[in-house]
Structure formats: C-alpha cells, structure tokens
Amino acid sequence: MRKAVRRAAAALTAGVLIALGSSAPVLAQGAWEAPAAEKAKKNPAPADAATVAQGKKVAEVNCVSCHGAKGKGDGAAAVALNPKPADWTSKKVQSESDGEIFWKLSTGRGAMPSWKFLPENDRWALVRYIRTLAAK
C-alpha cells in the first residue's frame, strides 16, 4: 500500500513538474517592456533612403522567416511560434520608441533571438526600416 502511494505521489509530482516546465516559457512572456533608459535612446542612424535600404536588407536576411516579407508577423516559421512574431505594421509596434524596438531586437526573448551580434548600425537601420512599414 505504501509503495503504491509513493508511486502515485512520485507520478503526480513528475506530472506537475513537467507541466510547469513546459508552460514556463509561455508564462514568462507577459508584457515585454524595455527599461526606461533604453526607451529614451534616440536613433543615431540617418533617416534617409540609404539607411532604410540597409535596414530592409538586414530584415530580408535575418527577419523575414518569422516576421514575413511585409513585416506582418506572418513568415513561414511563424506558424510554429507561440507567441506569434510581432506585426511591425501594427499600432502597437509603431507606437514604441526607436530605443525600445532597438532594445527588443538586441535582447530577444523566447522564440525571438537576440541580434546583438549584428553591428549596432545594422540594428538601428532595421529600426528605420520598420518605421517605413507603418499602416501598410
């Protein structure tokens, strides 16, 4: 009898740990807020066609598989992701500061990788490109 109770308790404990472990990434998502100092950062990249073209190239090489060709979060890999990739054309993304977007793509979270290995000027150019996608 004791052996059966111990087995049941062990099975229940294992089940709870597995459930908590598999749901932890989802529970950890919550609001994704950049620190105030990061939100306040200004984009040093020029707001010109060359910078936007540079940012578009960065997106095509690194981001399209998840965010899609038009930045709507509908890339081929997005089907398997939860939460879904951000829609760069959305009011939510477009209302974020340049510093906040830069911080998010530099830091990453969950399925969103950190792009810190990309040169800083490429990441700022990507922010400039994302800005061109508003309401498209």
Regions found by a protein language model. Give the residues of each.
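Extracytoplasmic electron-transfer domains, predominantly the class I c-type cytochrome c fold
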Residues: N82-A134
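Sequence/structural segment immediately N-terminal to covalent heme-attachment motifs in c-type
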Residues: A49-K72, A78, G99-T107
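Electrostatic cytochrome c docking/interface patches
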Residues: G30-V58
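Sec/Tat signal peptide C-region and signal peptidase I cleavage site
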Residues: S22-A28
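Bacterial N-terminal signal peptides
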Residues: A11-G21
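Short glycine/proline- and charge-enriched loop/turn segments
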Residues: A36-K42, A80-D87
